[in-house]
Regions:
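Short, charged low-complexity linear segments at domain edges
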Residues: 24-47
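A structure-centric signal for secondary-structure junctions around beta-strands
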Residues: 53, 60, 81, 105-106
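N-terminal chloroplast transit peptides
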Residues: 1-23, 29
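Thiol/selenol-based redox catalytic cores and closely related redox-interacting motifs
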Residues: 90-176
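Active-site-adjacent beta-strand anchor residues
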Residues: 59, 85-86, 143
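Conserved helix-turn-beta segment immediately C-terminal to the redox Cys motif
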Residues: 74-85
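Local sequence-structure signature of Cys/Sec-based thiol-disulfide redox active-site neighborhoods
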Residues: 44-76
Length: 176
């Protein structure tokens, strides 16, 4: 066992056990019980799909690239198969929780369907499947690119999106 000592070094700590060791456990501290009940975010957000089963695209509302992406999807979705919600909105934060993500995490586009959620390149491919030709066919071929390569490209663009495309002063919201 090592022990950190002042000055940045380490010291070796030797521990000798008696010949007979009892396996008795003593509780030193217990975690407090949560004051609130655990929230089932799927149930809490089921109203989003009660009257409208279309998937919801969650996007960064202050990102110029993301807003351009939403406009592109809207222009190529003549049948209005996708709804839109900014990640920063209250509904967006709830849907992030439903997807098992941190409500403050705006690092990825998320496509929330009734029974599952998609992030990063999987979300982009799934969105492409919903919009007009030729994008579903393009998504079909892109799925053969290994996910780690697709996500690597996605993450590099996403982490530099403000620097490359800028940021807007206000969060853009779109009507569904």
């Amino acid at each position: 066992m090592a022990l950190l000592v002042p000055g940045g070094g380490c010291a070796r700590l030797g521990v000798s056990l008696p010949a007979q060791v009892s396996k008795r456990r003593t509780v030193i501290a217990a975690l407090p019980r949560p004051e609130r009940e655990t929230v089932d975010w799927v149930d809490a957000t089921s109203s989003f799909f009660q009257n409208d089963s279309r998937p919801i695209m969650l996007y960064d509302g202050v990102c110029n690239l993301c807003n351009g992406g939403v406009k592109f999807v809207r222009d190529n979705d003549r049948n209005r198969r996708i709804r839109y919600e900014a990640l920063q909105s209250e509904a967006g934060r709830k849907l992030l929780r439903r997807s098992g993500r941190d409500p403050d995490d705006i690092s990825s586009v998320v496509l929330v369907e009734q029974d599952r959620s998609h992030i990063k390149s999987d979300a982009v491919l799934r969105i492409m499947e919903y919009i007009d030709l030729p994008f579903p066919q393009l998504a079909f071929f892109l799925q053969f690119v290994p996910q780690f390569i697709r996500d690597f490209a996605y993450e590099n663009i996403a982490s530099n999106r403000y620097m490359m495309f800028g940021r807007s002063d206000s969060c853009e919201l779109y009507d569904n």
